[in-house]
């Protein structure tokens, strides 16, 4: 890839209840993201952080912090849209996973058939009716598919952003009942940890590449809780039995070799819950693999 990489920080923590994930972009930068990508030969521009207005935080009676989450994602969508218009590669740093609403709103308008790889322990397919918590970080994939609160679904004036047949979830091991029902009804492609253990990551990525081969762009949305908590402890909703560090690098390396990733976000790094920024460092190392770093 010869595009300029545009790094966008999104210090959003209002899509969930645990403080600290707003420091995720800083933790990833502190692990030398910009320097290490520059050392790989990339032109990197750091566009700073999207401002989050905390003075007007107000819990909607239906969804927690709806207005603030919506306002932040509107700004993010506009920033991502501009980066893509300039023919650059958007790399978004979270922040909780609700930021994917803005990333995809700014990205999908540039593609007729955008594919999405959702690398996550969770489905993030909840709605107000199915969510046990009301936290919007459990809803971004549903919202992007056109399901959920009207104001979120219609961000940037169009919906849906993506189609269920163009989504692959990798690493799922914690799904709510409503999410399981939607997956079965829609036929969405999901690789749970059972499939990853049985098939191996090489086969999973090979099948994913084949499945998304008709897409004209592919967005990677990587939640660090997709990894096992032993490898990525600094996340808000850890689930044991996750994808290993090495399996994750293999996945990123294969995606780079295929040349299909056109945008990416790395989310849910929470340095307050981390150990010596281990998860922030892991995020940087996975970005490097996604963008082509190899031993030889």
Curated annotation (Swiss-Prot):
Disruption phenotype: Cells lacking this gene do not grow on arginine as a sole nitrogen source, but do grow on ornithine or ammonium chloride. Its cofactor is Mn(2+). It is an enzyme of class 3 (hydrolase). The keyword Translocase does not apply. Pathway: Nitrogen metabolism; urea cycle; L-ornithine and urea from L-arginine: step 1/1. GO terms for cellular component: cytoplasm. SUPFAM superfamilies: Arginase/deacetylase. It catalyses: L-arginine + H2O = urea + L-ornithine. It comes from the Bacteria. GO terms for biological process: arginine catabolic process to ornithine; arginine metabolic process; urea cycle. Mn(2+) 2 binds at residues 120, 122, 223, 225. Mn(2+) 1 binds at residues 97, 120, 124, 223. Belongs to the arginase family. Involved in the catabolism of arginine. This is Arginase.
């Amino acid at each position: 890839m010869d595009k300029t990489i545009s790094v966008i920080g999104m210090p959003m923590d209002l899509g969930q209840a645990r403080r600290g994930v707003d420091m995720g972009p800083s933790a990833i930068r502190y692990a030398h993201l910009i320097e290490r990508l520059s050392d790989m030969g990339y032109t990197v521009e750091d566009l700073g952080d999207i401002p989050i207005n905390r003075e007007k935080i107000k819990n909607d009676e239906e969804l927690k912090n709806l207005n603030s989450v919506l306002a932040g994602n509107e700004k993010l969508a506009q920033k991502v849209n501009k980066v893509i218009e300039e023919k650059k590669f958007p790399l978004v740093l979270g922040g909780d996973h609700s930021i994917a609403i803005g990333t995809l709103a700014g990205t999908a308008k540039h593609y007729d058939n955008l594919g999405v790889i959702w690398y996550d322990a969770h489905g993030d397919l909840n709605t107000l009716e199915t969510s046990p918590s009301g936290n919007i970080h459990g809803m971004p994939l549903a919202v992007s598919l056109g399901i959920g609160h009207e104001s979120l679904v219609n961000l940037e004036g169009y919906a849906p952003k993506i189609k269920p047949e163009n989504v692959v979830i990798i690493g799922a091991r914690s799904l709510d009942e409503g999410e399981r029902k939607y997956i079965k009804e829609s036929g969405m492609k999901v690789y749970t940890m059972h499939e990853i253990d049985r098939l191996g990551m090489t086969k999973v990525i090979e099948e994913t590449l084949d499945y998304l081969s008709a897409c004209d762009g592919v967005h990677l949305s990587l939640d660090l809780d997709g990894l096992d908590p032993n490898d990525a402890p600094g996340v808000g909703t850890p689930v044991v039995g996750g994808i290993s560090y090495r399996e994750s690098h293999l996945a990123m390396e294969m995606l780079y070799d295929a040349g299909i990733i056109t945008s990416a976000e790395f989310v849910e790094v929470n340095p307050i819950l981390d150990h010596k920024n281990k998860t922030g460092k892991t995020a940087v190392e996975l970005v490097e693999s996604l963008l082509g770093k190899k031993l030889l």
